[in-house]
Amino acid sequence: MVEEEFMNEFLKKTGYQVYKCKKCGERFWSLVPRDTCPDRPCSKYDFLYNEYKGVPPLTFDEARRKFIEFFTSHGHGYVDPYPVLARWRNDLYLTIASIIVFQPAVTEGIVDPPYNPLVIVQPSVRLEDIDNVGLTFGRHLTSFEMGGHHAFNKKDQYVYWVNETLQYAFDFFTKIIGIEPENIVFKESWWEGGGNAGPAYEVLVDGLELATLVFMKYKIVNGKKVRNPVLVVDTGYGIERIAWFTQRTPTAFHTIFSSLLETYKNILGIDEPPYDVLKKIVYLLSDKEIEDVYMLNKYLEEIDYSEYYKSLVDTINLYTALDHVKTLSLMLSDGIVSSNTGEGYLARLVIRRLLRTLIRLGIKVSTLEDIVLELIDKQAKYWKGRYVYDKFHRRLDYILDVMSYETRKYIDIVTRGIREVDRFIKKKKKITFDDLIQIYDSKGIPPEIVVERAKHYGQEIRVPSNFYSLIAARHGGSQALIKEKEHELPDEIVEWASKHDPTKKLFHENPYLRRASAKVLDSLNEYVIFDQTIFYPRAGGQDHDKGYVILGNEHIPVKHVYKVGEVIVHQLATKRRLVPGTQVELVIDWYNRYRLMRHHTATHIVLGAARKVLGEHVWQAGAEKTVEKARLDITHYKSLSDEEIRKIEELANKVIDERIDLKFYFLPKFEAEKRFGLRIYQGGAVYSPILRIVEIPGWDAEACFGTHVYNTSEIGGIKIIKAEKIQDGVIRLEYIASTRLPEYISDLQKEVDKALKFLGAKGLPISIVAKKVSEELDKYKTLLIQYRRLFKEILLKHLLEEALEICGLKTVVIEKQLEDEQLYKSIIEDLSLKKRVLTIYVSDKFVEIAIHPDEANNRKLDLRKLVEILQNMGGRGGGKPDHIYIKIKEPKQIVKLIVEAITNLLCKA
C-alpha cells in the first residue's frame, strides 16, 4: 500500500514523474527519465566529476549559514543547538538527530514547541556505524550537523505538511545552492527512530543523499504503529554533505577539516595518494560496500589501483583520527565523563578506538599521550570561534586532562592485558565473538590484541568488521537509562490514584506551613487522597514528611507519602476508610521537615561548588536527602584530593554566609531552558509543559520538586563527612548541615574520648597520642622483622633436616599452621626458588605447592594435574605448572594422598 504522502501534488505540478529503479526496485520521482535512482549503490558519486555551473563552492560554515537564513526568511523561528549529551531525555544518551530535541514532549503534544515552524542545525553523534568511518570517505561520520526544519501540526493548528516541505527542499537546493532541477531526485523511503515513524523522501543528487524529509505521523507502541496526535515534519539536511557536494573534493574530510587535514598529516607522518588519484579511487569505489581493509584491497585490485593500498589504509586511519578527535571534543566539552557505563562508556569506546587507530599508524606507546594531546589541541584551535565548536577551546583543559588520563589508563590496560588474554586463550578452545565482547567490556582490551595473542597459540580469529558498531549498539543511545523507582506502591493503588485530579501542593506555596486543613477526596484501604496537602512525598531523592491527620479527637499517624503523577497519596499507619468530603487537619513533623529542607538546599549549593572547583563537566548522577545527612553523586573521572574536597566545602559555606534569597518559578519548558540552560535537568528529564525552577541567584538553578529554605543563611553550615569513588566516573559526597553539625561534632568527640581512654591517654591531644602510638608501632615492626628473620632461619633448617626424597627430588611438607601470612609465603619462596625444594604447605583451609620452574620443566612435572585430582575431592583452585593453590576442606587428612600423587607424577616423569 502506497502512503498518501507519496501521492503528492507538488511533484506532479512541478513535472516530476514516478520511476522504479531497476537495481533496488524502489520508487523515485524525477524530472527526466532514469533507469536507476541516483543513490549508491545503484549509482556512483557522479557529483565528483559533474560540472555544476550555478553551484559555487561553499565552506562548511557557509552551508550552515545559508540553510539557517533560507528557513528563517520563510517564517521559521531559529532554535539554538542543544548539547550532544541528551540530558533532557531519559531514554537516550546522545543527541542523534535534530528531532531528538523535541521528542517526545513536543511530538506527542505534551509541550508546545518554542516556535512553529522552527529551524535548528543540531550537532549530532551516532556510533552505530563507527566502523565505517574513513572506509566510506565521509559518507559515515560519528559526529555531524543535521539541519532540521520542523513543523508540528495539531487538530486545531495546521502549519504545513508534504507539499510545502517538498517545495522548501526544491527551492533551497535550486535557488540557494544552485542545483539544476533536472539533477534533483526524490526517492520514496520509510523512517523510524526515537519511538516515531513515517513515510519519507530522500533528496538525491548524482549519487549523494543531501537530505531526508520525514513525515512523522506514527508512534511505535509495543511494536505497532499508532497514529500520532501531532503530525510532525522532521527533516534532516546533511550540512557536511551539502558543503562536500559544492566543493567536490575527493572526500568529505577535505571539506570539513580543510587545513586541519594537512596539519594531522604532518603530525602523524601520513601521505595521502595524489589528489587526482584519490578522487578517482573514491569515485570508482563509491558504489561498493566496503566493510574492512580486506575488501578494500580486493576492490583496489579490481580497479587496478592496488599499488595505493598501503597509502590508502593509512589515509583511512588518518580520516578516522580526524573524525574521532572532533567527536570526542564534542562529547567531552558537553560534559560527558568517561566511565564504564552509560554515555561515559560510549565516550571511552571512541577514545580507545582512536588510540588503537593511532597505534596502527605506527605511533609508539611511549609517545602516544603526547600525540593525542597535540591532535586535540590542533582541533580546538581549528574550530575556535566557529559555531558551537568554540567550546572546544573554552573547555580545552578538561578535554586534555581526560584524554591524558584515559590514554595512560589504556596503555596500562594493554600492557597488563597481554597476560590476562594469554590466560583466557589457554582456557578456551575457541574464542567467540561474545568472548571478544566480554574481554573488551570487562578488561578494556581491544579485539586486535586478542587476535595477535591468539596467533601465538595457533588460533585464527576474525574480528567482525563492525565490532565497535555492535558494541556501541549494545551500550548505545537508543537504550533506556536505568531510573530509580521512587516508590513501591501496589499497581491497584497507582491505577486508583491516577484517576484523580492533581493535588494542590501547599508545600510548594509555603514550605514553612506546619498545619493545614484538607478535604478527603477518596480513600482505599489505608491510602488517602486529599484536595490539598502540606505533606511532601518521597520524590527527587528527598525523604517524605512525617506527621499525622487529625480526625475529630483522633490523631492518625502518616506512615508514608507517595507521588503518582500530580496526585499525592498518603498512607496511614492504620487500615481505615476516610469518608470522601470529610474535613481533617494535617500536621507535619516540623523538626523533620526543616532538616530535609536545609539538606535539600545544601545539595544544590554543594553541586554548584563542585562544578566551580572541578569543572563544567560535573553533573548530578544521584542524590538523597534524609534527616540525618545528604549525599550527592557527581560525575567526575578521578578521585577527589583532600584539597579539592576542602575547596568545595569552603565555597559552599561562603554561599551560606552570603545570605542569598532563593527564587522559585513555574515556567514553560522551553522558556526555562532558554533562561537557565539545560543544567536545570540535574535530577533527570522532566516531561511536563511547566517546570518548577529553584534558583540560588548567581550560583545554581534546577528543575526541582523539593522543599527548600528561603535564604541560604538558614542552612547554618555544611560539612562534607565523606568523599569516595563509588564507580568509574562517579564520586559520592556525603555531608551534613544545620543542627546536624553540633550532633556530628559531639559524636566525633565521643569517639575521640573513647579512643583516648582505650589508649590510657584521656585528656591529651589526639595528634600527640597518635604520633606516639605510630612511633611505637614502627619500633615493634622493626622488632617483628628481626624476630621473623630469626624464626625463619630456625624453621628452614628444621624443615630441610626432615625433608623427604621423592624420586631424587628433595621435598618438604609443612603441616604447621603459620598465622603469619608474610612468613609462610617467604618460606615457600625460599624453599622452592632458592633451595630448589618441592614445597607442600598445608594449612587448615588450603594447600599450596611450589617448585622451581626449571625443576618442573626439566622433570616434565605439571602440578596442575594435582588440581584435577583434588577437585574430585571437593577442592577448588588452579595455578601454573610450577605453583598451585587449592582450597579444600580438612586438607591435613589428605597429606598422604598428595604425597603419593606427587610421587606418581615425579617417578613417571
Curated annotation (Swiss-Prot):
It is found in: Cytoplasm. It comes from the Archaea. Binds 1 zinc ion per subunit. Its main location: cytoplasm. The keyword Glycoprotein does not apply. Its EC number is 6.1.1.7. It catalyses: tRNA(Ala) + L-alanine + ATP = L-alanyl-tRNA(Ala) + AMP + diphosphate. Gene3D superfamilies: 2.40.30.130, 3.30.54.20, Bira Bifunctional Protein, Domain 2, Threonyl-trna Synthetase, Chain A, domain 2. GO terms for cellular component: cytoplasm. GO terms for biological process: alanyl-tRNA aminoacylation. It holds the Pfam family tRNA_SAD. Zn(2+) binds at H600, H604, C704, H708. Disulfide bonds: none annotated. Keywords: Aminoacyl-tRNA synthetase, ATP-binding, Cytoplasm, Ligase, Metal-binding, Nucleotide-binding, Protein biosynthesis, RNA-binding, tRNA-binding, Zinc. Belongs to the class-II aminoacyl-tRNA synthetase family. Consists of three domains; the N-terminal catalytic domain, the editing domain and the C-terminal C-Ala domain. The editing domain removes incorrectly charged amino acids, while the C-Ala domain, along with tRNA(Ala), serves as a bridge to cooperatively bring together the editing and aminoacylation centers thus stimulating deacylation of misacylated tRNAs. Catalyzes the attachment of alanine to tRNA(Ala) in a two-step reaction: alanine is first activated by ATP to form Ala-AMP and then transferred to the acceptor end of tRNA(Ala). Also edits incorrectly charged Ser-tRNA(Ala) and Gly-tRNA(Ala) via its editing domain. This is Alanine--tRNA ligase. It comes from Staphylothermus marinus (strain ATCC 43588 / DSM 3639 / JCM 9404 / F1).
